[in-house]
C-alpha cells in the first residue's frame, strides 16, 4: 500500500490529503483517525491514486494547470459556490465516483477523466 506523508503544512487546513506529483500528503492531525480505520485509509489512498494515474496521463506537468483551469471555469458555472466547483472538477468527479472500487485502477482506461468534462 502506498505510504502517506503526514505533516502539519501540506495540505492546507480544511483538507485531509493532497496528491502532488504522485506524493500523497495528509494532515498530521488526521493520522490516528486514518491509520486506525482501514476502510477510511483505503478510500483515501484509492482516491489519491486515481489522481496519480491522471497525473501520469498528463505527463505530470499538465495536470495541475488543467485542474486549476477546470476549477476556475466551475467557479463561474456554479456561481461562486467553491465547494460545488471543487466537487465538479472532472478529475475529482472520477476519483469520487470510483474511490470505493477495489479494482478500478486495474481496469481503468487511459484518460477516463475525459468522460467527466462535459457530463454533469
Annotate the PLM regions.
Residues 36-37, 41, 57, 61, ...:
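Generic, well-ordered alpha-helical segments
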Residues 41-45, 50, 87-91:
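Soluble or luminal CAZymes and related metallo-dependent hydrolases
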Amino acid at each position: 500500500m502506498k505510504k502517506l506523508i503526514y505533516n502539519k503544512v501540506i495540505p492546507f487546513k480544511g483538507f485531509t490529503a493532497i496528491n502532488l506529483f504522485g506524493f500523497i500528503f495528509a494532515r498530521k492531525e488526521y493520522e490516528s483517525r486514518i491509520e486506525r480505520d482501514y476502510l477510511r485509509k483505503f478510500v483515501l489512498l484509492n482516491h489519491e491514486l486515481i489522481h496519480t494515474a491522471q497525473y501520469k496521463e498528463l505527463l505530470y506537468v499538465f495536470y495541475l494547470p488543467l485542474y486549476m483551469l477546470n476549477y476556475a471555469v466551475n467557479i463561474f458555472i456554479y456561481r461562486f459556490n467553491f465547494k460545488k466547483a471543487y466537487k465538479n472538477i472532472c478529475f475529482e468527479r472520477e476519483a469520487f465516483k470510483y474511490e470505493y472500487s477495489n479494482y478500478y485502477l486495474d481496469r481503468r482506461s487511459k484518460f477516463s477523466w475525459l468522460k467527466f468534462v462535459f457530463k454533469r
